[in-house]
Each structure stands twice: as structure tokens, then as C-alpha cells.
Amino acid sequence: MVIGTMTNLENQLHAQMVRAIEDVKDSKKIGISFSGGVDSCLLAKICQDLGYDVLLLTMGFEDSHDVEFSKKMAKMLGMDHDVEIISENTFSDVAKKIWDEINVDNLSWNENCIAFYYVAKLAKKHKISKVITANGIDELFCGYNAYRDSVSDGEDAVLDMIKDKLDNELRMMKAVNKIASEFDVTIAQPFLSEQFIEFGKTIPLEHKINGKDDLVRKHIVRKLAMSIGVPEESALKLKKAMQYGSLIHKNLLKVKKTWNMNF
């Protein structure tokens, strides 16, 4: 771990991430929800450096971006990895089942619950009862493209958006865990802990986003990732949300009319 190359703020962020992960890690073997993007690679690398017994878990339709990219990044990290390929034959029924269970007319919530259904299913196959995710990083560090619009309205507008997105994410992850419980799996989010959120809010905005034309964002997260050995290809990769990278979004829009889904 090349801690010496970090700035003081990056060191603080790293220490807070380690602490947050240690607070949720209570089983011998853990799964990590893994797309190969900077957030999940950073989470995986920290767990690897801590000496944890880890399996990287990816889901997606065959030949989807996340399936292919995650394989490449897992190999570069030298970590164990497995992939759950979503069956086109059963996807519609799974989507309907989750729609009924969470009873929320929100496209993103349904997409995420479907994604974690397959992650939890894969974890169960490996007798893993806890899966750790990097949810919270995009919310706290301006990962979403929408932050480019709010930054033009000033810092207060960005801070309001951070709060709103965190509130939504915390509520959504309760629905995710409801779905994952079918497989006796808990989905843990260390970067949505109260302590980590409070720390994340103290990091100056210029370390997160540099104006309305900033296509990269999450700058301190990306720098930290490269400092501890995350492949540059992942660390500098632009955001592609789980539901798009896995092709869940595309396929859910295809089946929603079948079930009269209102989103």
C-alpha cells in the first residue's frame, strides 16, 4: 500500500474508509458487489490490503459492459471473482416479483433491487452471508452527472443535492436488503454509515467537482484509488451506473408494459 504518496486529506479519507469497512465486516468471508468501476475497485483493494477473505460478485446480462469489464479488473487486482449471468427467459418474472415486493413506482429503486437480487443469489451460492457495497460514494463525492447542473447554482445547491441523494440511497438500501433477505444475505454499505457521511461532508467541494463541465468528478476518490494500486483504467473511468452497465435498465423497460409497471 503506497500510503506515502497520498496527501493528508487522501490519508484521512483512506483511514475513514478502512474504519467504516471494519465496522461492518463481521463474517469470515465476504462478498463485494463489483462492477470494476472506481468505487467497487477501491472497496475491493482496501479489503484485499486488510487481508480479508473476499469474493468479487458481478451480475449482468451476457456480454454486458459490467460483465466484461469486471472480469478484466478482477484479473488485474488478482482477486477471486464470480459472475451471475441474468437469464433473459426468467428476467421478466424476477422483475415482476420485485416490483410486487417493494411496491415502489421508482425506476431506479426497482433496477437496483433487481441487481442486488442477483448479487445476493450469487452470494448464497458461495455460502456468503454478507455482501459489502460502495454505495454512498457517488452521493457524497458528486459522482452523478446531475451534480454538474446543481454546481452552477452554487455550493448550497450542491450540498442540498448531496443530502437528498443520501436520503434516497439510505431508504433504497432498506428495500434492497428486503429483497436480499430471500437468500439470507445482508447487503452492507460502509460508506452510508453516519460517521462516514459526516466525514465526507467535511471534504471541500473542489475535491469532488470542478464546475458544470466536469465529466470526471469524484477527484479525491480517484486519486486515492490510484495511490493504493487500483488500475488507472478503473480509477479514471467515467461513471456508468449499475443498471446501465448490467443492461438491467434496457431489459426492464422492455418488460414493464407486460406487467403495467408505472415508471
Model-assigned labels for residue ranges:
Residues 3-228, 242-254:
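ATP-dependent adenylate-handling active sites, centered on carboxylate activation for C-N bond formation
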Residues 209, 230-237:
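Acidic/polar loop patches that form or flank catalytic/metal-binding clefts of enzymes
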Residues 236-239, 255:
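Generic cytosolic/nucleocytoplasmic N-terminal low-complexity/intrinsically disordered segments
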Residues 251-263:
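Long, continuous compositionally biased terminal/linker segments
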